[in-house]
Amino acid sequence: MSKVLTKAAINPLGFLVTNAGVLSLVQDAGRFGAFNLGLTNGGPADSLAFYWANSLCGNALNATVIEISLGGLQLIAQVDCIIAVTGAPMPLTVNGRAKTLWQSFLVKAGDSVCLGFASVGVRCYLAVAGGFVIKASFGSTATVCRESVGGLKGAKIAVNEVLPCHVVSRGGYLRKHLMLPESRQPHYANEVLLHTVLSYQQQHFSAIEKRLFFANDYQVSKHWDRMGYRLQGRAIKADINGILSEGICYGAVQIPADGQPIVLLNDRQTIGGYPKIGAVISSDCAKLSQLRQGDSVHFEAISMSQADNLFHLNLSRLKQAQLIHL
């Protein structure tokens, strides 16, 4: 893709936002190394869909994309460019004509790009060749609205804003576009298995409470967002109501006083004082982020070595997946 773009092709034009949708955010891979400043990671809720959106456009893995939650985003292209949309199945049209997700294609200046609403799942990712050109804040373009950091103004994308991007060169028109085979595309469902590594604070939960936690299903409550998912189901009790505030990892499963688990995600606070029964592995956190109220999860306890094996298995599958030239 680097042969398609030139430095001269970078300009303040890109996509004009005519409808911002339910929640659309500028995101790159995330903001790291700023916990000491009280700044969390941000980044894509579904890291796998984010990865493929950038890969289909030939981008670096940290290139800036747009994360669309639930749908409704509408844009007018101001330049010729190559885009791809991945993630939850949202109807995608260009000038009213249906387009396919999980593949890259050319969009010309003046084209209208519209996303409908997801029938299942929550989030999708719109990438453009070369990435959106957004100024980094604290080393990242990732938007965290709670912290007013990242993106264009530290907030969600708004109507009449322009999302700058690169212009495709004349040679780009002749470039073969890419598609991820359907067999390699994620399946979005209404229930997810969450592999969980027990934490050292498991000592505050009796053997019976832990067995009940892993034996029962939980439903996503009405309180779910990029910060975390509050679940509802069989309450789990710890022998303490709180701990001294400490750092919180991605995927941490907090058990507050009411016993209803909270799985913390990208926009979580950097410290917290609830006991944690364990942590969900990152690949399953991405799956969790595609659930909505009423959907179901089941926790399964695994060891650190099993978590490491799953990481390498998922990495191997990612490397084996081959994009198809169209």
Predicted regions, residues:
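Conserved "landmark" site that anchors the functional core of diverse proteins
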Residues: 1-326
